Design a protein with these regions (language model features):
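Rossmann-like NAD(P)-binding element
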Residues: 37-40, 55-112
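Helix N-cap / loop-to-helix initiation motif
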Residues: 38, 131, 159, 209-213
Length: 325
């Protein structure tokens, strides 16, 4: 975890995401000032913090000194002395544009402002900002206090200095910032999730599988690998000693088969090499058999954790087959 000069964070919006940010910041000893026009927001956030705290403590994610949580009446009061601003209002573009216009009028000029938007373009949110160069997307995943990914997305107006400052701050919170290289709607992770979701809807609509069976297909197979390897490294290791090159040669032609409802890109030689090279860089100097051992240990430990903390007693969480009903 890196150090940060940010000591006071303003949160605009206190729903699931805003409350999650508050919890993570408090666990890292920061002062948090939150504003939300809803009268129930304060109780909601305080309850989220209290409920999450034992889990964070058991996981060793709480600093020695718990941060302080304050509630402000409006945006101006919340952001005026903040070192960092994270906006978490509902995903409506015009609302966010208006909120960021107000934030930019009251926050210090040197303060980075991030939006938790899950799909909007930062260039659109900058439309009425006094200092658009400091505004970007900082898209987390719920529960924010546990999941480390945060996608940082800037526009042509966003300064690289501001992006670097945001990345350093998120790292100081124990998160894993991912800088999206180009401004694009829905960024990276949600696009991947959406692709899987669309295909799952097709399978349900065609009567191929139930919701539980589709979830089981993910959690019992690729999902366990994805938790620590991702898509490409899993395929790289699945190709045996030949790695991704062997996987592409063996399964590449299957991309042309009409199995899914998403059109795949043409698998050109250039694209093949980019994928292979990327996998080899990611796996680094680790030997193939070493990676296999590490993968197997991770898979075993993940399943132990799921069995102990997720599934009900005497159940394994797997849906019954049709012949068992």
């Amino acid at each position: 975890m890196t150090e940060s000069n940010i000591k006071k964070v303003a949160l605009v919006g206190g729903g699931v995401i805003g409350g999650g940010w508050a919890t993570r910041c408090l666990a890292n000893g920061l002062e948090v000032v939150l504003t939300d026009p809803r009268p129930e927001a304060q109780d909601y956030v305080e309850t989220m913090v209290a409920d999450a705290w034992p889990v964070l403590e058991d996981a060793g994610l709480v600093s020695e000194n718990k941060g302080e949580l304050h509630f402000a009446q409006d945006i101006a009061q919340a952001v005026q002395d903040a070192d960092f601003v994270q906006e978490n209002v509902p995903e409506r573009e015009e609302l966010k544009i208006s909120v960021h216009e107000e934030i930019s009028q009251h926050a210090r000029e040197d303060v980075v402002i991030a939006s938790s938007s899950s799909g909007l373009l930062p260039s659109r949110l900058q439309a009425r900002c006094a200092h658009p160069e400091r505004l970007m997307i900082g898209h987390p995943f719920a529960p924010v206090y546990l999941l480390p990914l945060v996608e940082i997305v800037g526009s042509e107006q966003t300064s690289q200095t501001a992006i670097a400052q945001a990345g350093a701050f998120y790292r100081s919170l124990g998160m894993r910032p991912l800088h999206v290289r180009r401004e694009i709607e829905a960024y990276i992770a949600d696009r991947l999730q959406e692709s899987l979701y669309r295909e799952a809807l097709h399978l349900i609509d065609q009567g191929v599988a139930t919701v539980a069976e589709i979830d089981a297909a993910v959690t019992g197979g690729p999902g366990l690998r994805w938790a620590f390897m991702g898509t490409f490294l899993a395929w790289h290791l699945g190709g045996g000693p030949g790695g991704m090159r062997h996987t592409i040669e063996q399964f590449g032609p299957a991309l042309e088969l009409p199995w899914s409802h998403m059109k795949a890109p043409e698998l050109t030689d250039e694209l093949k090499e980019r994928i292979v090279d990327g996998c080899e860089v990611e796996s680094g100097a680790r030997a193939f058999d070493e990676m296999e051992r590490r993968r197997d240990r991770c898979l075993a430990e993940i399943q132990k954790v799921l069995k102990e903390h997720w599934y009900p007693p005497e159940e394994d969480g797997w849906p019954p087959m049709a012949t068992d009903r």
